Each structure stands twice: as structure tokens, then as C-alpha cells.
């Protein structure tokens, strides 16, 4: 399945629009990961712990989006938008939401 942030696919013609598809994935970040990330924050630098969680959540959300598009009979999703949110009273959850338009291309 072709998945793209652009509204069209070069060299392909959209022959049918199947509708908007979306998926959301929420992951919890546990205390050990929070502790490791806070040490990184103190000394500066990137937090690989949070980055890995975001990557995993994004990949899950994209896969779920593709599954939903396939259920509609689509073979591509165009106009993908990926949003990230921090949830919970202490920011202990990360949400990735993905939306796009399921289409059939030739």
C-alpha cells in the first residue's frame, strides 16, 4: 500500500475515493523510562527512551491506518497527517494520531 503526505501520487491516477481514515495509538511511559529521560534532560541531549516510544507509536498508527484503508478497498492513502500529543496529569502518556484519505490508484 502506498502511503504519502502529498495529495496525489506522481505517476498514479486516483480513480476512487474511499473516505477518510484515521488511527490513534496511546502509549504509557513508565517510571523507569521517565527517570532515564529526566537524567538525559538534566545533562542535555536527546532522550532515546522517548524517541523510541514515539517511533513505535507512529509505526503502529500508520500500520493501523493502512489496515483500515485496506478494509475499505483502498490501495493507497494520500494526504497523511501525523500529530503527537502528551497526555495524562504528569505527561505519562504519548498519543500519535494519523489521518488521511483512502483511495484507489492505477
Curated annotation (Swiss-Prot):
It comes from the Bacteria. Gene3D superfamilies: Hypothetical protein apc22750. Chain B. Pfam families: YbjQ_1 (PF01906). HAMAP family: UPF0145 (MF_00338). Belongs to the UPF0145 family. This is UPF0145 protein Csac_0771.
Amino acid at each position: 500500500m502506498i502511503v504519502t503526505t502529498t495529495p496525489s501520487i506522481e505517476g498514479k491516477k486516483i480513480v476512487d475515493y474511499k473516505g477518510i481514515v484515521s488511527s490513534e495509538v496511546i502509549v504509557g511511559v513508565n517510571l523507569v523510562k521517565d527517570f532515564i529521560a529526566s537524567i538525559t534532560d538534566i545533562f542535555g541531549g536527546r532522550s532515546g527512551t522517548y524517541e523510541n516510544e514515539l517511533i513505535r507509536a507512529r509505526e503502529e498508527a500508520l500500520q493501523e491506518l493502512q489496515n483500515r484503508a485496506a478494509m475499505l478497498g483502498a490501495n493507497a492513502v494520500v494526504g497523511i497527517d501525523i500529530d503527537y500529543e502528551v497526555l495524562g496529569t504528569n505527561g505519562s502518556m504519548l498519543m500519535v494520531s494519523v489521518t488521511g484519505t483512502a483511495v484507489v490508484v492505477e
